[in-house]
Design a protein with these regions (language model features):
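Intrinsic, low-complexity polybasic segments
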Residues: 2-3, 8-15, 19-20, 32
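Phosphate-binding P-loop
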Residues: 43-49
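Conserved P-loop
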Residues: 50-139
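Conserved nucleotide-binding/hydrolysis micro-motifs of P-loop NTPases
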Residues: 85-89, 112-113, 154-155, 186-189, ...
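Phosphate-binding/switch loop-helix module in NTP-utilizing enzymes
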Residues: 116-176
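Structural recognition of the conserved hydrophobic beta-strand(s) that form the central parallel beta-sheet
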Residues: 150, 179-184
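Phosphate-binding/switch region of NTP-binding enzymes
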Residues: 185-220
Length: 220
């Protein structure tokens, strides 16, 4: 399993045993044009399962993960998305994901709105986070999924509902070609240090500041 599945492949550089899909070959050409060092980095990393973090106060962390999931499914990969805090509220992407069958599975593992803060944290929410993490750990280590998205897990960690070291330990043990995306504000430094790619979303302005409500089909 992994990213190199396309029937259209190219042999790269002086090593004819390395075979890339058309899209990966294009990326290699771009890297090569930037210089041998960049091309060498591309060849070293092309078969690595990435740890990606989408964090920051701006909008689009889950949306970006969904876009990556769509790209992955289009390349023949299997995707599991576990939403740690989202509950039964209906999101448009749930309907879309169903059309992919077992190639893209999405599960809402929480109750939606979480009350946090010391003794006020609801034990039921903590229990549900524990269940979500148990399923996530099994899914990651099984190697049955090419991409596992841990949506809102950064919130669960920052709310002290989940120990970051437990998450880090599983990330260190993950199968080589399994990709992981972790989303949510306030990504823990331990997770950031382990990640290959970290993007911090920054809010410049938002429609709600003008009193415009979330738009169906765009934001949910």
């Amino acid at each position: 399993m992994g990213i190199l599945r396309s029937a259209a492949v190219s042999r790269v550089g002086a090593n004819p045993s390395v075979r890339l899909s058309a899209s990966d070959h294009l990326q290699w050409i771009v890297a090569q044009s930037a210089g041998p060092r960049q091309a060498s980095h591309f060849m070293n990393d092309v078969r690595k399962g990435l740890i990606i973090v989408n964090t920051g106060p701006g909008k689009g962390k889950t949306t970006a993960a969904m876009g990556t999931a769509l790209r992955a499914v289009g390349n023949g990969m299997r995707v599991l998305m576990l939403q740690f805090l989202k509950g039964s509220w209906h999101y448009g992407e749930l309907d879309a994901v169903q059309s992919f069958g077992d190639k893209f599975v999405m599960k809402q593992m929480g109750r939606g709105f979480v009350k946090v803060g010391g003794a006020e944290t609801d034990p039921e929410d903590i229990r549900m986070v524990e269940e979500a993490w148990a399923e996530a750990e099994q899914a990651i280590l099984s190697g049955q999924w090419d991409l596992v998205i841990l949506d809102e897990i950064n919130y669960a960690i920052s709310y002290k509902m989940l120990d970051p070291e437990r998450v880090a330990e599983v990330l260190r043990r993950k199968p080589e070609m399994v990709h992981i995306i972790l989303t949510g504000r306030n990504a823990h430094p331990t997770i950031v240090d382990l990640a290959d790619t970290v993007t911090e979303m920054r809010e410049v302005k938002h429609a709600y500041q003008k009193g415009i409500l979330a738009q169906r089909g765009i934001e949910y």
